């Protein structure tokens, strides 16, 4: 018969059958030959007891099997195994309310679990609070295991008894953390429980100076709705967030109502039994209303160090905004030498954007000649405006201007911002076009636009007419211009034209040309040769009279060259037609 390691734990007898592993609740037992799920293996691994094995070797082997069925090292990598371990520990440290809900979501990684918790915290109407306790031994549990025997033996007082007993002892730190009240003799083997018991004893000594927060019977809860009474040593173990959480108030699960301090006037009426105890209001009473504030600094039940800590927190709060002192503007501040009429005289001058930009580099210290300060009275405001604008303001009522205003000298409009004033000046300048082009007479509103326009007139014009000497930027413009010179009436002098007209009147109508030849109305001005069509004349001039002009386009089939690529392509098409005919004839 195997022997047990611990004298208090006995190995099962040979006649007795070993205890069967119970399946987790809500899951059917796996059929024989089928591997259990990883979640089932994890729960069996965590719930395994030494008494379920016949000996230490069998217990170790059983733990190896259950751990392998949970972590699956043959499938998962090291990173995935670590992810499963961290996920299990994260779920174990969650509060009971959040833990059960997150486990039901079956997260596969820590990021999914964190996302589920964050989504639950953001859910409206359910302000889950993160209950941060003092350090206690980590017990990994899935949330379905039964309570310990000591916890099951703790009596649960009904709500009615707790509501009636107003002089009950305050809740201690050990009771808040769920630790049972044991005598020191039973805590010799557990050092953590010894520390908790010592904290409980110190807390009992301070109960004479501390009172508890009593709630109505319908809202009584053993942990959530009570102010925790910690000793000075307990308070030193908590961080500032936990100190504020436990010391001021605890937000419950079903109501998100907090009672900030420093508002004694908004406290509700208290009955005779609750004169010195603040009451937490119901959620339905505070919907749509401003939350009242309750101050705990004047309560005699608080420890001195608690009062000091709360005062420090209140000092760190954002103070109310105080009204800035208004600067008094002297009424006799006028631009341009202190004369109130100098403004009207300066408005008659021409205002440019450059003057406005240079006049107000720093708007607080320097003001341009057209930036006026706010005057003392409405009459003084109207006194600084032009007559046209003054009459309109008198008819419409009081002039509402800011401390700093810009007045347009042309129309009298007032602008508060300098940017709008400059934009207004630019719009007026665009409407007026004082700059005229000396070549074509076009009008421009800006001198820079005129300079750019003049550059277009001075651009290079390589195409020059041989008859009159005019230059053109495009060859098409030159060809259209040559049509004027190709007309015979315009080529002849005025006297010859008059003489020819008189001769035609004397002789009568001309006879048609011999051999049925058409009339040649296009004559070359250089050689006198006449052509029937103007394109024939243009070809004649390009071949015979423009030989000195550069011909960069050379034909690859012959020695001819052309001035334009279009003529070269048309010439090469003739070569291609001839070659195609020769190729067809060769077959």
Curated annotation (Swiss-Prot):
Zinc finger intervals, C2H2-type: 406-428, 435-457, 463-485, 522-545, 553-575
UniProt KW keywords: Activator, DNA-binding, Isopeptide bond, Metal-binding, Nucleus, Phosphoprotein, Repeat, Repressor, Transcription, Transcription regulation, Ubl conjugation, Zinc, Zinc-finger
CDD domains: KRAB_A-box, SCAN
Residues spanning the membrane: none
Domain KRAB: 221-291
Record InterPro entries: KRAB, KRAB_dom_sf, SCAN_dom, SCAN_sf, Znf_C2H2_sf, Znf_C2H2_type
Cell location: Nucleus
MF GO annotations: DNA binding; DNA-binding transcription factor activity, RNA polymerase II-specific; RNA polymerase II cis-regulatory region sequence-specific DNA binding; zinc ion binding
Stated family: Belongs to the krueppel C2H2-type zinc-finger protein family.
Reported function: DNA-binding transcription factor that can both act as an activator and a repressor.
Protein name (record): Zinc finger protein 496
Species for this entry: Homo sapiens (Human)
Gene name linked to the record: ZNF496
